[in-house]
Each structure stands twice: as structure tokens, then as C-alpha cells.
Amino acid sequence: MIEPLLCGIVLGLIPITLMGLFVAAWNQYRRGSALEG
């Protein structure tokens, strides 16, 4: 049985991780487009 605390931590980390990856990709995309144009 999964502990509620552990479950809460996992459910809290997943969106943060996805948002972090999205921000990193967005920054890299902006930097690349800025260098091109």
C-alpha cells in the first residue's frame, strides 16, 4: 500500500518536472531562434 505522503510527493513532483523540462526546452528554442534571426 502506497503511503499518502509518498503519493503526494510523487504527484507534486511530476508536474514540476514536466514544467521544468518545458521551460528548459522553451529557453533553448528562444535562444536558437534569437541566434538565427
Swiss-Prot record:
Keyword annotations: Electron transport, Membrane, Photosynthesis, Thylakoid, Transmembrane, Transmembrane helix, Transport
Membrane-traversing stretches: 5-25
Subcellular location: Cellular thylakoid membrane
Membrane association type: Single-pass membrane protein
Pfam family, one: PetG
Highest taxon of source: Bacteria
Record's GO cellular component terms: cytochrome b6f complex; plasma membrane-derived thylakoid membrane
Family: Belongs to the PetG family.
Known partners and oligomeric status: The 4 large subunits of the cytochrome b6-f complex are cytochrome b6, subunit IV (17 kDa polypeptide, PetD), cytochrome f and the Rieske protein, while the 4 small subunits are PetG, PetL, PetM and PetN. The complex functions as a dimer.
Name assigned to this protein: Cytochrome b6-f complex subunit 5
Gene, per the UniProt record: petG
